[in-house]
Amino acid sequence: MAYRAGFVALIGRTNVGKSTLLNAILKEKVAITSPKPQTTRNTIRGILTTEDYQIIFVDTPGIHKPKSKLSEFMIEVAKRTLKDVDLILYMVEPDTSIGPGDRYILDNLKEVDTPVILVVNKIDLVPAERVEEAIKVFKSEYNFKDVVAISASLGTNVEVLKEKIVSFLPEGPRYYLDDYITDQPEKLIVAEIIREKMLYFLEEEVPHGVYVEVESIKEREDKEIVDIDAYIYCEKESHKGIIIGKNGQMLKKIGQAARQDLEEFYGKQVFLQLWVKVRKGWRDNEKLLRKLGYAIDK
């Protein structure tokens, strides 16, 4: 049996479960997950390598109407991804009608030649009849190569989906070494873990107006300890107060939760220090967005 390797895009509306699926397949926390929309900013590659195949997953930001330079970047990344991969997984919820968000995505899919598998997620939340009806509705709009109904959070049919993905991969050598799980820089992984905790603990408006910049990551020579210094930047003074919280309790809660995940990631004790600063209008600052890795090459 020839070795197979290829790139697979995860695409869909915000919050349909793309990152949850990626993490379930890889058994590692690679993509940031949260119940709030627009939580994935960077194109994150999760890499699954076996003796027979290698799948490089590209987890795109959700497509939505742009409201800032940052969201324009997110949408441009998602649209370009469609043309640069071997297979697209189009993830939807079991809706019995197609809303404007999915209509916009379907229109974009019709502009590319890449094969598409329809992945209907969250089947554990609705009756089977509704799942079947949703599949009929979406199949009437697009000629999908295959359809798989799953529950990413429970792992239902995830292995079935994995087998179907492999069948679409081209024959060829692996792109990454066996022990690679993601090609994200270390500081980006740390920053995303911290930002994920803010998404869980803070009010709806605040987390999407923040970014995390990791100043330093140092391993102590004499002890099994990793020292991490990071800055949380927000757009408003009022947001700074919310992030810090009364007597610093909210920042402490964010730091403790992030530290637990970071200690699991590093396999050793982590000493995490967080600071909060205000940087007004950062989401429309092209120079800063480019520095943070959000810029699109024209």
Swiss-Prot record:
Residues 202-280 form the KH type-2 domain. InterPro entries: G_ERA_dom, GTP-bd, GTPase_Era-like, KH_dom-like_a/b, KH_dom_type_2, KH_sf_prok-type, P-loop_NTPase, Small_GTP-bd. Keywords: Cell membrane, Cytoplasm, GTP-binding, Membrane, Nucleotide-binding, Ribosome biogenesis, RNA-binding, rRNA-binding. It is found in: Cytoplasm; Cell membrane. Transmembrane segments: none annotated. Residues 59-62 are annotated as: G3. An essential GTPase that binds both GDP and GTP, with rapid nucleotide exchange. Plays a role in 16S rRNA processing and 30S ribosomal subunit biogenesis and possibly also in cell cycle regulation and energy metabolism. Residues 121-124 are annotated as: G4. This is GTPase Era. Residues 4-171 form the Era-type G domain. The keyword Cytoplasm applies. The lineage of its organism: Bacteria, Bacillati, Bacillota, Clostridia, Thermoanaerobacterales. GO terms for cellular component: cytosol; plasma membrane. It holds the Pfam family KH_2. GTP binds at residues 12-19, 59-63, 121-124. It comes from Caldanaerobacter subterraneus subsp. tengcongensis (strain DSM 15242 / JCM 11007 / NBRC 100824 / MB4). Residues 12-19 are annotated as: G1. GO terms for molecular function: GTP binding; GTPase activity; ribosomal small subunit binding; small ribosomal subunit rRNA binding. One of its GO terms (biological process) is ribosomal small subunit assembly. It is a peripheral membrane protein. Gene3D superfamilies: 3.30.300.20, P-loop containing nucleotide triphosphate hydrolases. Residues 38-42 are annotated as: G2. Belongs to the TRAFAC class TrmE-Era-EngA-EngB-Septin-like GTPase superfamily. Era GTPase family.
